[in-house]
Curated annotation (Swiss-Prot):
Pathway it works in: Nucleoside biosynthesis; alpha-ribazole biosynthesis; alpha-ribazole from 5,6-dimethylbenzimidazole: step 1/2
Annotated gene: cobT
Organism name: Methylocella silvestris (strain DSM 15510 / CIP 108128 / LMG 27833 / NCIMB 13906 / BL2)
Lineage of source species: Bacteria, Pseudomonadati, Pseudomonadota, Alphaproteobacteria, Hyphomicrobiales
Record-given protein name: Nicotinate-nucleotide--dimethylbenzimidazole phosphoribosyltransferase
Similarity comment text for this entry: Belongs to the CobT family.
GO MF annotation terms: nicotinate-nucleotide-dimethylbenzimidazole phosphoribosyltransferase activity
Its EC number(s): 2.4.2.21
GO biological process, one term: cobalamin biosynthetic process
UniProt function note: Catalyzes the synthesis of alpha-ribazole-5'-phosphate from nicotinate mononucleotide (NAMN) and 5,6-dimethylbenzimidazole (DMB).
Gene3D superfamilies from the UniProt entry: 1.10.1610.10, 3.40.50.10210
InterPro entries from the UniProt entry: Nict_dMeBzImd_PRibTrfase, Nict_dMeBzImd_PRibTrfase_bact, Nict_dMeBzImd_PRibTrfase_N, Nict_dMeBzImd_PRibTrfase_sf
Keyword terms of this UniProt record: Cobalamin biosynthesis, Glycosyltransferase, Transferase
CDD domains linked: DMB-PRT_CobT (cd02439)
Length: 341
């Protein structure tokens, strides 16, 4: 799919072909909401969520039978600059923990009946150090984007996007700095717990990387290639694949939103099918969501990653669907509707 044209241009072409929502289905969902046994608007954002799902699933009564968390894992060459509190080996160790069912995301998915798939992206071959050269070649970027697209099986009715990768808050900060400007300090946070000299090294790495690649950063896809990582490209591909299949998406936190921000910078409508699952405690995430035009569903002070915040939001989304499809209308319940003013 991505091999016929110049690699990055083929990604751009796909983004430009993404289908719109069904306004007819959304209108029908809102009409049903108006007839349910409650004051109009009294369920707040639950009503908005139900109409949102209806618009992307293309039916007045949305379903939520096969939600999936897809976690993409990768390692980053910039870790060699001492930007993380943990070594790259932790990424593989966490893959084993996911497989054994011992991670937080396993428990959250189990609690809410959400499927979980974890995808390793060449963990033993980190991307290049972004302070010295581009993270990936264009062909590698496109191939990884395509892998992310193919990772989304048919039958999924809600996709939660997550990540795992030592050093990936550094590349996410570099992406936001490149896209939105300001200073590195505006976007760099503590990630998995860096402080002191390590935090200063992280800040310096982001400054150096963006300065090195600045002549090429007017193109968001070059931002992804030069400053990103394999999980960033794969998550971007998964988000686009979901759109092509009319699958609504729940974004997780800070790093996932770096992939989302790339798509949004290419096309402002690219994230119309996405909800923000939560507000991360990684400081700049709130500003990122503001720029993406997303209001988070949850704010629990989390900064774990793994798709954990998105998975937690599934419980809320399931409640929205249950109310929308299971509540009686005024006529069905033989309850009088609103009278007068």
């Amino acid at each position: 799919m991505l091999a016929d044209a110049a690699p990055l241009d083929s990604i751009r072409h796909l983004i430009g072909k993404m289908p719109p929502a069904s306004e007819r289905a959304a209108a029908a969902a809102r009409a049903r909401q108006a007839e349910l046994t409650k004051p109009q608007g009294s369920l707040g954002r639950l009503e908005e969520i139900a109409a949102f799902l209806a618009s992307w699933q293309g039916k007045p009564s949305p379903t939520l039978d096969r939600p999936l968390v897809a976690v993409f894992a990768a390692n980053h060459g910039v870790v060699a600059k001492g930007v993380s509190a943990y070594p790259p080996s932790v990424t593989r160790a966490m893959m084993q923990n996911f497989s054994a069912g011992g991670a937080a995301i396993n428990q959250i998915c189990g609690a809410f009946g959400v499927g979980l798939k974890v995808f390793e992206l060449a963990l033993d071959i980190p991307t290049k150090d972004i302070t010295e050269e581009p993270a990936m070649e264009a062909a590698e970027t496109a191939a990884t984007f395509a892998f992310g697209m193919e990772a989304i099986d048919g039958g999924v009715d809600l996709l939660c996007v997550g990540e795992m990768g030592i050093g990936n808050t550094t590349v996410a900060a570099a992406i936001f700095y490149a896209l939105y400007g300001g200073s590195a300090a505006d976007w760099v946070g503590r990630g998995a717990g860096v402080e002191g000299e390590a935090l200063a090294r992280k800040m310096a790495a982001v400054e150096t990387a963006v300065a090195l690649h600045r002549p090429f950063l007017s193109d968001p896809l070059e931002v992804m290639r030069r400053l990103g990582g394999r999980e960033i490209a794969a998550m971007a591909g998964a988000i686009v694949a979901a759109r092509m299949q009319n699958i609504p998406v729940v974004l997780d936190g800070y790093v996932v939103c770096a992939a989302a921000a790339i798509l949004h910078a290419v096309d402002k409508s690219a994230l119309d099918h996405c909800l923000a699952g939560h507000l991360s405690a990684e400081g700049a995430h709130g500003e990122v969501l503001r720029r993406l035009g997303k209001i988070p569903l949850l704010d629990l002070g989390m900064r774990l990653g793994e798709g954990s915040g998105a998975a937690l939001a599934v419980g809320l989304i399931k409640a929205a669907v249950a109310c929308h499809t299971g509540m009686a209308t005024f006529a069905e319940a033989q309850v009088a509707g609103k009278v007068g003013g």
